Amino acid sequence: MKAQLFAVLILIGVIPMAIFAWVLIHTYYDEAINQRINSLQSHGDVISNLLVTTGYMTDNTISEANSEIAQVANIYDGRILVVDDNLKIIKDSYALEEGKTLISKEVIKSFKGDNNHYINKKKQYVEMTIPVTHTDSGKIIGVIIMN
């Protein structure tokens, strides 16, 4: 009788604690992803504004923009690509794909004005595209891809 009562009390205590722990862990994980997305978006906006104000999309040798891209890529231990309006990669923080053409659904959507992000929970990474919009004309002159 005492063993049965003890087993029931254990089940009543352990099951709710296990459910609570599962909910807490998943909530924390989702919040961490949202913070990462917001932080990437903020840095992406800074890079986008820098690309427009320095004229980087026409002259990609500007050291201020190159150092900012490299610094943000190092902070997030990720990769940043800058694509011009001809879908040519003009900057790759890994320096592997520069000069090549990048055609992807996400980039095309960004040229239409959408900010996209893709979350791969299994491999634990976020990929984000940010349009580079010219301040005077409002025309999208490029896309930043961050992951």
Where are these regions (language model features)?
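Extreme N-terminal signal-anchor transmembrane helix of membrane signaling/transducer proteins, especially
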Residues: M1-H26
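Juxtamembrane membrane-water interface segments immediately C-terminal to a transmembrane helix
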Residues: L9-I12, H26-N49
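Extracellular/periplasmic ligand-binding regions of membrane signal-transduction receptors
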Residues: I37-S63, G78, V82-E97
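Extracytoplasmic/secreted envelope proteins and their assembly/folding machinery
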Residues: Q41, S48, N66-I69, T129, ...
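Extracytoplasmic/periplasmic sensor domains and loops in membrane signaling proteins
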Residues: S63-S67, K88-V126
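Short regulatory alpha-helical segment in sensory/regulatory domains of signaling proteins that mediates
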Residues: I69-Y76
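Short loop/turn microsegments at loop-to-beta-strand junctions
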Residues: D77-R79, E127-M128
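Short, hydrophobic beta-strand elements of compact beta-sandwich sensory domains
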Residues: Q124-N147
